[in-house]
Amino acid sequence: MKKILAIDIGYGSVKVIYGYSDNTIKNQFKFTSVVAVTGKDEYIKDKRIVEYKDKSYYVGEDALQFPSDALIDITEFKNLIYFAPLFVYTAIKKIGEIPDTIVCGLSKAQLQYSLAFKEAIQSFRVNDEEFNFENVYLLPQGAGSNITIDSYGVDFPNKQQEFTGLSNYVGVDIGFNTIDIFLVTNGKTSPYLFKGIENEGVMKIAQKISEFIKKEYNKDISLHEAKEVLDNGFFKLRGTKYDLSSIIKGIKEVYLKELLNLIEENFNNALDKSDYVFLSGGGSAFLNDSEDKKIRTPKSNFEYYNAIGFYLYGLTKWRLK
């Protein structure tokens, strides 16, 4: 029985699905795509610290406990590829097993760097441990979502019942930095429309929240700290929680209007012959209560649709061997 690590290394969070070639999923979890740089002290031993490329880091939620100036936001591709091995390492340590196969993805907007990204996670060293993986596969982000939609529709882990398999729809995967848009005709992904757009993801909401906090509280926070405010609905400063839910609601509404306008302006011809628009990714959670009958979103597991698809792809690779 082979072990499959499906890992969606996003700019906002790292989503993980881990399972076996018998179709059993063992782990499903996520952690924030952020690191904090720290120094070393021979008298202080902290097991949370990881050594990577001659520097010491805290990763994910451990990093978010540190001051903003210690954080490195993963908002640019150069940081994503640099720290990708560290995120893979963190996932492996949380799982407690070494996978036989790794399946991950990149936005269509960045697929020109796919070889370099694949090589980065094929072989690396963290905490004096060497990792080498022979079976590493890289898919476009939207492709992962599409595989999941085909199998589960809107209701993972329940097998889909409502789609005929011959639907025409526009799929939109909303990430932290990028959005990936793809066209499905008669149940199959079409090369006619498969596009990734940078700097149009949930990061735009985080930027607005960061700007509000700077203006209102005179505090500079990182985009990942702003994402935490977005997720929780409040800003915590020196032990006091400030309710920002109404501010966040307004920012979300503006973003969603801009997003739908972007899709309409760029892909109106494809929309004309589509039955609906399927939104996935973390950003789709903001539209799950939409009254628009033409918009569909997952009932749950919004952020995991790419990672689930990556796992399903990994299953097919072992079945073919």
Show where each model-derived region lies.
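Active-site-proximal alpha-helical scaffolds that flank and shape metal-associated catalytic sites
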Residues: 172-176
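Long, charge-rich alpha-helical interaction segments
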Residues: 207-215
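A cytosolic small-molecule/anion-sensing beta-strand core signal
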Residues: 185
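Nucleotide/phosphate-binding catalytic cleft detector across ATP-hydrolyzing
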Residues: 1-169, 188-202, 216, 224-321
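A structural feature that tracks compact, well-ordered secondary-structure segments
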Residues: 180-182
